[in-house]
Amino acid sequence: MRYRVRGPEEIVELSRRSGEVSTIQSVQGTVEGVVRPDFFIVGAFKSGTTALYEYLRSHPQVFMPFLKEPHFFGDDLTRHYGRMSLSEYLALFRDAQPGQRVGEASTWYLYSTTVPGQIAEFSPQAQIIILLRNPVDVMYAQHSQLRFRADEDQADFASALEAEPARRRGERLPPPPARPETLFYRHSVQFADQIERYLRIFGRDRVHIALFDDLVTDTAATYRAVLDFLGVDPTFRPDFAVHNESKRVRSGAIQRLIYNPPGPVRGAARVLRRYPLVHRARDALLGLNSRAEGRQPMDARLRAELLDEFAPQIERLSTVIGRDLSAWRN
C-alpha cells in the first residue's frame, strides 16, 4: 500500500514493505509551513512515557502535539481508528514555532520491527528516547491498562499470560480485537532485541535510554538528562505531577464505547479525535468514568516465576544498554 502527499516543493511517499526496514522516501528541501518531528519517544509501554511527554510539552523550547501516540509509523502495528494519512500526521506539528525541537511519543514504536527504518528515512537526523522498566512489571501494568481500556477479557493476569500462544495464532482474542499485539505480553517486552534495532540504525549517540526507576526516584535529574540530550535549556523545571496513574473503570459499557465504538461511529470518531476540543472532551469523559486506585500487588509466586524466566533477558538487556539491572531480578 502506498501513501502519497503532494506539496508545493515536496513529495513524500510511504511504501509499506515487509522486512525490518520499510521505506519512506522524500525530496529534501525547505518547504514553507511543513514541519516534521525531529525526536521520538518510542516506548516502552507503561514505563513513564506519559509523564515525560507532559513534562516536555511544558518546555518552551519543545513542541509536542496534543495527541499523544499518533502511531503513524509501523506496518506491523494495528490501530483502533486506522492509520492516519501523512497530511493528518504532519498537521499535528503545524503549530510548532521556529527554533523549537519537535517530537512525538508513540509507545508501540519500540515493539515494531519496521518503525526504526521508517523514522530514519522520514527524519534522517532524528533522535530517539527510550524509557525502560522491569519487563515483569511492564506486563502486569500492561494487563491492568488493557483491562481499563476494555481490550482484555481475561481478568486474571496469569490467565492472560497462558492465553498468549493461542492469541498469537489468532485464537482466543477478545471481541473486538482492536490491537492484538498488545495482548502478546511476553513477546512485547523483548527489550534487548527492540533496542538493538534502534542502535543499529541510529547509533548510540542518537539514542537516549532512561529507566522508569530513575524517573520515579529522581525525576528532576532524569528530565534534565533528556533536555541535555535534546540540546534545550536544562534549567527549565516543570510541575512534576504524576500522570497516567492506575485507575479502575466505573462503567465497562461506557469504556467500551469510548475505546471501541461500533462500526457506524468508528469512522466519525477517527476524524473527530484529531481535534483538540474533542480530545479534551474524551479525556474528561474518561476521567468521569474512572477513579484512581492503586494496583493490587502481583501474586508473589507468579512474580518469582516470571523473574526467573526473564533473568537471562534482563542480563542481556543490561549488557546492551550498559546499566546494572540486578535490582530488577529481586
Range-by-range predicted roles:
Residues 2-330:
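Anion-recognition interface
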